[in-house]
Amino acid sequence: FSVFSNSYMAVIGAPLALKYARYSNDRAESFRIRTEILQDEKGGKTVRKYPLSKEAEAHVRHMAEAYEKLKDRYAGSRLDVNVCHLGEENGIPYAEFAFVAGRPLSELMDECLDRRDVEGFHKLFAEYLERVGYGEDVPVADFDLIFANILVDGDHWTLIDYEWTFDRPIETRALAFRAVYCYVLEDERRNALELDRILDRLGITENEARQYREQEMEFQKYVTGQKLSMGEIRNLLGGEVYKPT
């Protein structure tokens, strides 16, 4: 570090409670939030989500409502829903979640693919379908039930992020297709996945897969307010490396 930097910043005082912060500010005004991980003096951690605008306050409050509805839907299942409570700080509401132990399901799936354990991957996928599909006909569903939003700790699977919960039933196969679609897009190493086998398992035709992809594009427009997200901007710019002459 000393080789590349000729300056530094020293913070003097008690340890900061804030350990991590992420800004989701490439969204529509009504969905912009800040996510924080806080640690108390005893080492206990909590997660908080704050609105970044007055318009986003309703979105944050909706998270607590989503928790209650999803908790009821998955009562008796083998999928836990991370606890959420509403709080207020300087007149600004926030949603507070427990800090859950475990590893993202996506990491466990990656390990299967890295060691070419295809059957291990599909075993985890089958477990995902069984757990998230509980109460499929109930008129509430988390549209963003991707693998990275589930933490696995032994036999305990916990849904940790459910801000995109809607008051309508959504077919499990639609949620699963989106989870796989997002999973593959996030890392090119995952292109080795046998998508045809997954489509067959879900009973999804090529035409239906195309429709689901179009729905995903519409959802992203809904989230970003028709604006380009940072990920979309990066894709448009490309990754070319220019050598100076």
Question: Locations of the language-model features?
Answer:
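Short acidic-glycine loop/turn motifs at beta-strand connectors
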Residues: 41-42, 90, 153-156
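Catalytic activation segment of kinase domains across protein kinase-like and atypical kinase folds
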Residues: 137-191
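Hydrophobic residues embedded in beta-strands of well-ordered beta-sheets
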Residues: 45-46, 93-95, 156-157
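Rossmann-like AdoMet/SAM-dependent catalytic core
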Residues: 1-36
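Helical subdomain adjoining the active site within ATP-dependent kinase catalytic cores
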Residues: 168-245
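Conserved structural core of kinase catalytic domains
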Residues: 80-129
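Structural preference for long, well-ordered alpha-helical segments in enzyme cores
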Residues: 63-70, 124-128, 132
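ATP-binding glycine-rich loop module of kinase domains
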Residues: 23-71
